[in-house]
């Protein structure tokens, strides 16, 4: 196993052990680069996470990721329409990628929002996570 893969497993396994959870009960999330990492880890894990929530991120390398997908985890991506750091067009590109790869995707473009997480985005994420935890 690669070092990156060993670290992914180690963190997930520690959380599972400490909180007595299954991977299917764990939601992963990230902002900006953390979103990019969450998508990568969540879709290439050998066990499916409950869901992924990403804020202001993008897919780093679509060709590479599409060849490594092992889990079809439900995803919510949220982006501000005024984001100067990670352009909002990345949300649409990611949505297209997920649809083409048959991954359930929900998106939210927040109006008048730059590169941060507003209350509207936090509320949407919380509702998405609740729905996914209840339905699994």
Residue ranges and their predicted role:
Residues 47-59:
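A conserved short beta-strand
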Residues 20-30:
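Alpha/beta-hydrolase fold nucleophile elbow
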Residues 1-11:
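Single conserved hydrophobic/aromatic residue that forms the stacking wall/gate
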Residues 40-44:
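Active-site signature of alpha/beta-hydrolase-fold catalytic machinery across serine-
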């Amino acid at each position: 196993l690669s070092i990156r893969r060993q670290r992914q497993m180690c963190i997930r396994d520690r959380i599972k052990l400490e909180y007595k959870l299954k991977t299917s009960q764990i939601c992963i999330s990230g902002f900006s680069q953390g979103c990019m990492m969450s998508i990568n880890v969540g879709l290439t894990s050998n066990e499916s996470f409950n869901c992924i929530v990403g804020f202001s991120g993008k897919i780093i390398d679509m060709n590479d990721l599409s060849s490594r997908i092992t889990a079809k985890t439900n995803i919510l991506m949220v982006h501000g329409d005024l984001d100067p750091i990670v352009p909002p067009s990345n949300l649409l590109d990611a949505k297209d990628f997920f649809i083409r790869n048959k991954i359930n995707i929900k998106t939210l473009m927040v109006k008048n929002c730059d590169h941060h997480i507003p209350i509207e985005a936090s509320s949407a994420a919380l509702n998405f996570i609740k729905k996914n935890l209840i339905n699994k």
